[in-house]
Amino acid sequence: MMEIKVPMRVSELLKTTVENRHREKLGTIQDFMVGADGRLKYAILSHGGFLGIGDVLIPIPFDALMTGYEKGTVSLDIDKQTLEKALSFESKTWPDFTAVEWDEKIDRYFAAYKAGASQQQPVAGSV
């Protein structure tokens, strides 16, 4: 769903604000993960906290993101409460992204928000 001018540098998306359809700030993009196929798999969203203190990192499937409503933003069609239930980790304890279970849980949780998906809500506790 990422409808941005391509090609573009990934670095242009670092520190970009991510908002939902209600224009609530969900966080900022802090990093990216590349899959085994060489494509961008996840945008790593910094969420919560204050000035980077106390925040958690949430891997968001790259294809769940869209251009934002405001210039210089990216949009994710999810409410804050649902986002807060997603798998997350602290910046000092990155998970093993090669673990199949981790990928499956993330993909299952965000399936409703990927391009072409129906607008069903993820099942709470599915991660």
Label every model-predicted segment:
Residues 1-127:
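Peripheral interaction segments used for macromolecular assembly
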